C-alpha cells in the first residue's frame, strides 16, 4: 500500500503543478496595454478622418481619394 500512496501523491503534485502553470497569467502576446474595444471588425477600421475605405463598409464612406 505504501508504493500506491506514494504514486498517488506524486500524481497529485503533478496535477497541482500543471494547473498552476496553466493558470499563471501570461503577457507574451500583448504589449501590456489595454486596447479599447471596437464594435466594428478590423476590415471596417476607419482612418484618422473617420473614413472607411472598404467597399463593404456598413456606414457611409468618405468620397474622394485617400
Swiss-Prot record:
Domain of life: Eukaryota
Propeptide residue range(s): 24-46
InterPro entries noted in UniProt: Conotoxin_a-typ
Chain positions with Threonine amide modification: 63
Single Gene Ontology MF annotation: toxin activity
Signal peptide segment: 1-23
Name this polypeptide is given: Conotoxin Bu1.4
Amino acid at each position: 500500500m505504501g508504493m500506491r500512496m506514494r504514486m498517488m501523491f506524486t500524481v497529485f503534485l503533478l496535477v497541482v503543478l500543471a494547473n498552476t502553470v496553466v493558470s499563471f497569467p501570461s503577457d507574451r502576446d500583448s504589449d501590456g496595454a489595454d486596447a479599447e474595444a471596437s464594435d466594428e471588425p478590423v476590415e471596417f477600421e476607419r482612418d484618422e478622418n473617420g473614413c472607411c475605405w472598404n467597399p463593404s463598409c456598413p456606414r457611409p464612406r468618405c468620397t474622394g481619394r485617400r
